[in-house]
Amino acid sequence: MSAKTLENQTALLQQQEQQLRDAVSLAIEIAQKAGAAAEVGGTKSGGLSVSTRLKEIENVEFNNDGALGISVYLGQQKGNASTSDLSPEAIKNTVEAALAIAKYTSPDDCAGLADKELMAFDAPDLDLYHAADIDVDRAAQLALETENAALEFDKRIVNSEGASFNAHTGVRVYGNSHGMLQSYLSSRYSLSCSVIAEHENQLERDYEYTVSRNINSLESAQWVGENAAQKTIARLQPQKIATQQAPVIFLNDVATGLISHLASAISGGSLYRKASFLLAHLGKQVLPDWFHISEKPHLIGRLASTPFDSEGVRTQDLEVIRQGILQTYLLTSYSGRKLGMQSTGHAGGIHNWLVQPNSSGKLTALLHQMERGLLVTEVMGQGV
């Protein structure tokens, strides 16, 4: 790995970061001169994706995207506009477009910037960016090694849906007329594989993946490929089970989907629209008393870590569920005002939910403890 290459990558991102900061500052300045409050978010991202299928390179993709999103407030009238052109003239035209839109919108008592005292003026460095010296050849090698490991694992693996390696880096900048201007760099790397197994003319498929901010923290290509094959083979020879009452364990990927329904039900948008099954449940028992969820937005280097939300509100540790009791709603500034409450820093979503286990063992230990029951590996359909 070339240290010079990594330095150049980082220097380029830092240059883009400064360009975005300048663009955000200019947009806010133009809006303020027109008598409006403003918030501006800027992003710049680039990446490489290489996929293989049946031991041959199938696709190589490069991406390079950037945008500036501008929201202005004339009193409580709001206008939005965006541009991918960061020239001063384009920024001026975009702000003017947002102002023109705002003049034709109806006033909304809940519209406006998030409260100034909630801003992340002192946003911490969460170590979200790790440069990697990765090119097409190395990315293809990783994908091919992954797929080969899966195909060679067992003769029942008869086909492949492919393997892929993805590398992504980006810059995020946010500013508003409260004087907030913060930014950070980020990276994300992933390696995945999906294969097909056959037994007595019955086909099954499954997959495996690894993802991290740091390429050196990814699981090996061998691990991803063999796990994809092993999970696929485990699906062969399915059997019907008799109707019965039994304990149930959800695999972590499936459980994440279930927990996302909880997050949606306690989000401010669902609550003020009265589209939630947990209306008026704050402080009430919603889950078993052994169930706990906490949110940790500032964990170093984690995928869902962020120092501030998409409104610039400082993120903070929260207890979401404690002993089965709902401790907080998930609010933006708008939904908070609709409900007569304060933003909780959730514009843009949730950040690192940690489910505290009620058992010290991992899956194998849980299965031994269950003795006989149902392990749910996949669900179909929508809703809960």
Language model region names:
Residues T5-G47, I266-P297, G349-R372:
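Short, compositionally biased leader-like segments
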Residues L48-N64, N166-S194, G324:
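Conserved alpha/beta core surface patches that mediate binding of polyanionic ligands
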Residues T83-D85, E208-Y209, T332:
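Residue-level structural signal for beta-strand termini and adjacent loop
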